[in-house]
Every structure is written in C-alpha cells, then in structure tokens.
C-alpha cells in the first residue's frame, strides 16, 4: 500500500508538470462545472437565505428543516432525477442539456443550493440576535439593520460558498449520470478517478485524486487567507513567519 501511495504522488506530479493536455483540460472542465454550478446556486440561494435568516413567518422552520435535510441528498438520486427530466422524453429535454458540462453544472447548482441556504441563513440568524437590538438602540431603520447584519456575515457567506464549491468539485453521481463521462467532453476529475479505478490503473486514479485534493485545499486556504487579511490579522510589515503563524491560527 505505501508503494502505491508513493507511486501515486509521483504520477500526480508527473501529470501536473508534464504539460499533459488531457489532464489540464480535465482540471479546467472540473473548475468550470463547479464554478458555474456554484454561481447558479448563489443566484437563488442567497436571496432565500436572507429571507430565512432575517425575517419571521409561518412555516419558516419547516422550510429550513427541508433545506437542512436536503444537504444529505444522495447525488446519484438527484442525478437520476435530472437524467429523466433532461432526456428527450423529459419535461426539459428541449434544453439539450443532457450529456453536456452545462447540464452537470445545473445539477450541481441544485445539489449546492441547500448548503448555501442552510449555512448562510444560520449565520444571519446568529448575527441577527447580537446586532438587531443594538442597531435599534442606535436608531437604525429595519433596512439599515438588515444591511449591517449582512455586512457582518459576509465572510460566513464566503465560507458557505467555498464549502459549496468544494462539494461540487468532488461530486461524482451527477457528473457520471448526467454527463456519462464522455472523453474530452464531459469527463471531470471525479469521473476520471472512477474510470481509472475500474480499469485497475490505481496509480493514475490516485494521482487524479491528489490533484483534486490539492485544488480543494488551495481554494480553501486562499479564501481563509483573504479573510484574515481583510480582518487585519496580518500586520502591514509581515515576514514569511507572520504569514505561517496567521494561517496556523
């Protein structure tokens, strides 16, 4: 087992630094699908989260409970539902999204919606308790109070979006069922891992897995670093040691 892991790391760096066109095309395709899916999800998830997080109405907790439950929806079940809807005989077959990267992105947008809604609405509610009374004491209007709460939770939103992107980036079921893993068309990192594993080429499969993990970790670290910079946790005159200490906290 250790030999396989070592060979996988060697293969991963070979694939990265060899300039292999298919590897970079697969990585780009994965980033495109996850990025577009996350962007689409944000378009409707953020307004829903604001309504759930800042306003009270009947049935609110039922709706929140549904979104919380949908975080754990099996991706293969969602992929199957999308396949039926996007097929030629389905209600949305006229869109021509089946077997395309855009179709996968739409599926991922639906998958990521509960994550963004649940995380963001919870952050807004937590901030609401702390800030609303203070804002009213200072004479702020309801609109200004809500804007203040949203401003205070912007980094919670950023982390929710990052978590959603990472979830989509590592998703397999929708990509496999809706995109069917067409070579140079809909093949992404996760489906590549599945294919090479089935072929018994474990070193290449693990290499793709390592590349996937490197990208996910890098995206998360960059977002965390930007958050710390914006919060002035990194001094103006900083050294490499300062950066390491800040990232370690």
Name each region found by the language model.
Residues 48-82, 238-249:
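Cytoplasmic-entry segments and transmembrane alpha-helices of multi-pass inner-membrane transporters
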């Amino acid at each position: 087992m250790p030999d396989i892991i070592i060979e996988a790391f060697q293969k991963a760096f070979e694939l990265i630094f060899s300039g292999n066109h298919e590897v970079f095309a697969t990585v780009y395709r994965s980033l495109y699908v996850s990025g577009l899916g996350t962007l689409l999800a944000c378009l409707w998830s953020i307004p829903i989260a604001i309504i759930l997080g800042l306003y009270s109405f009947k049935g609110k907790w039922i709706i929140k409970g549904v979104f919380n439950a949908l975080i754990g929806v099996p991706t293969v079940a969602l992929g199957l539902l999308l396949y039926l809807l996007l097929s030629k005989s389905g209600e949305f077959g006229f869109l021509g999204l089946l077997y395309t990267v855009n179709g996968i992105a739409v599926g991922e947008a639906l998958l990521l919606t509960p994550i963004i809604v649940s995380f963001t609405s919870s952050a807004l509610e937590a901030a609401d308790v702390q800030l609303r009374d203070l804002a009213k004491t200072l004479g702020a209007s309801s609109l200004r109070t809500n804007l203040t709460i949203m401003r205070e939770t912007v980094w919670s939103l950023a982390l929710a979006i990052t978590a959603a992107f990472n979830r989509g980036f590592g998703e397999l079921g929708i990509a496999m069922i809706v995109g069917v893993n067409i070579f140079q068309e809909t093949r992404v990192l996760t489906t590549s891992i599945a294919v090479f594993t089935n072929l018994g080429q474990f070193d290449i499969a693990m290499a793709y897995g390592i590349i996937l993990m490197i990208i996910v970790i890098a995206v998360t670290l960059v977002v965390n670093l930007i958050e710390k910079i914006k919060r002035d946790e990194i001094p103006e005159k900083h050294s490499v040691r300062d950066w390491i200490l800040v990232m370690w906290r």
